[in-house]
Regions:
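Non-heme Fe(II) oxygenase metal-center motifs and adjacent flexible, charged/small-residue loops
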Residues: 2-159
């Protein structure tokens, strides 16, 4: 599965404090999604990244790549990601998402889950370089997987 983080939301689907999630189903045709998936798998600059965890460099269980506007950098878990210039398929997705959401996006962190063991752990997109009210768009192409949310301070989780 390829997860492209941009966030597509249309109606609030969860009613929790400090959480606004909207879901735009059927925003793209199957042909568009198939074309973007094939192009992304074949042409994006996938890297096997590492994060710093308890002072040690650990390989992350997925491939990823960072595409962004010039001058837009991203660092998490002690690692600065290598910025790539926009790929045409990602730019096409970005432009469609901007029309749907009426939001502007300046970057994408694409994650490729190669098999059933690749994953993303619980995390918060709270890096200091992100503004508090940043919109995050998430597009999933390929095999369907659950997208789960967990409250940081309360015992609430859902997918």
């Amino acid at each position: 599965m390829l997860l492209i983080h941009f966030i597509l939301m249309h109606k609030n689907i969860f009613k929790y404090p400090n959480l606004s999630i909207k879901n735009y189903e059927d925003s793209f045709t199957k042909d568009q999604a198939d074309r973007w998936l094939e192009s992304s798998l074949d042409e994006l600059n996938w890297l096997e990244g590492e994060i710093k965890l308890f002072g040690k460099d650990i390989k992350i269980p997925r491939l990823q790549c960072w595409y962004a506007d010039e001058g837009c950098n991203y660092k998490y878990s002690g690692k600065m990601l290598e910025r790539n210039n926009w790929h045409p398929a990602l730019l096409e997705i970005k432009n469609k998402i901007e029309v749907i959401t009426s939001q502007k996006y300046n970057s994408v962190l694409a994650n490729f889950y190669r098999n059933g063991t690749d994953s993303m752990g619980w995390h918060s997109d709270d890096e200091s370089m992100l503004s508090k009210d940043s919109a995050i768009a998430s597009v999933s192409l390929g095999q369907e997987r659950p997208l789960c949310f967990k409250h940081k301070n309360e015992d609430i989780s859902f997918s």
